[in-house]
Amino acid sequence: MLGLSAQWMQLNPDNNRANSVAPLLVSSRQGLGKSTFCRLLMPDTLKSYYTESYDLSSPASAEAKLAAYGLINLDEFDKLGASKMPLLKNLMQASALNIRKAYKHSASSLPRIASFIGTSNREDLLVDRTGSRRFLCVSLKHAIDCTTSVEHKQLYAQLKTELLSGERSWFNKEEEQTIQQHNALFYKHVPEEEVFRLCFRFATEEDNPQEVLSLSATQLFERMKAAHPSIMRGMTAYRDR
């Protein structure tokens, strides 16, 4: 919430720091109020600046919404394909936008306003492990109380006061590392990872040096393919993730 408020207040215009972290509310059970809770974060006067419509297949439209909305809900985040993650990562990091409006010949520089939040009905939802620090996965154990009214004025007044008093609105390196460790519970396991575990293990000091193999990535792949051809069918050693 501090990051969201700082983004709205444009408190970091000079250091190119954007709110690049999105909480993800995760539960395999439906009806716990995930999407409702996301909507409730916005006060009534800002409801029109909330959206659950975010199409990553249209990069220009997705970028424009960073300047048009205050909170973007990546609803059903687990349905986003791995091929969309690089674009989403870039959009989440964007601090300044160059957008060409309709009927205009040149682009205009617009401030980034939007922050992200998301929901998922699956726990194996993260496919980009190098970028997992950008997502703060929260596993829900019970329904969210969406009936008690949110005191938006008090909430945002407190956030504003803390920010103007110098409160940090981003995670440092140590905190990012903790987030990545926590997110290991939410990684999507791909078939070749399972095959690798079946075929190999890392050597230890107790192993006989004569039995320890030094293999290249290609050699590892060929052995995995030979051991489990049906699982590895259609895969190559250089497949782009």
Identify the function of each model-found stretch.
Residues 1-67:
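P-loop NTPase catalytic core of nucleic-acid-dependent motor ATPases
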Residues 85-108:
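Conserved catalytic/switch belt of AAA+ P-loop NTPases
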Residues 126-145:
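A short helix-turn-beta junction within AAA+ P-loop NTPase domains corresponding to the substrate/partner-engaging
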Residues 69-92, 126-131:
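Conserved AAA+/SF3 P-loop NTPase catalytic/coupling segment centered on the Walker-B
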Residues 170-241:
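DNA transaction DNA-binding modules
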Residues 62-67, 101-119:
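AAA+/SF3 P-loop NTPase mechanochemical coupling elements
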Residues 148-185:
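Long, low-complexity, charged/polar intrinsically disordered regions in eukaryotic proteins
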Residues 68-70, 112-115, 130-136:
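Short glycine-/polar-rich loops that comprise or flank the Walker A/P-loop
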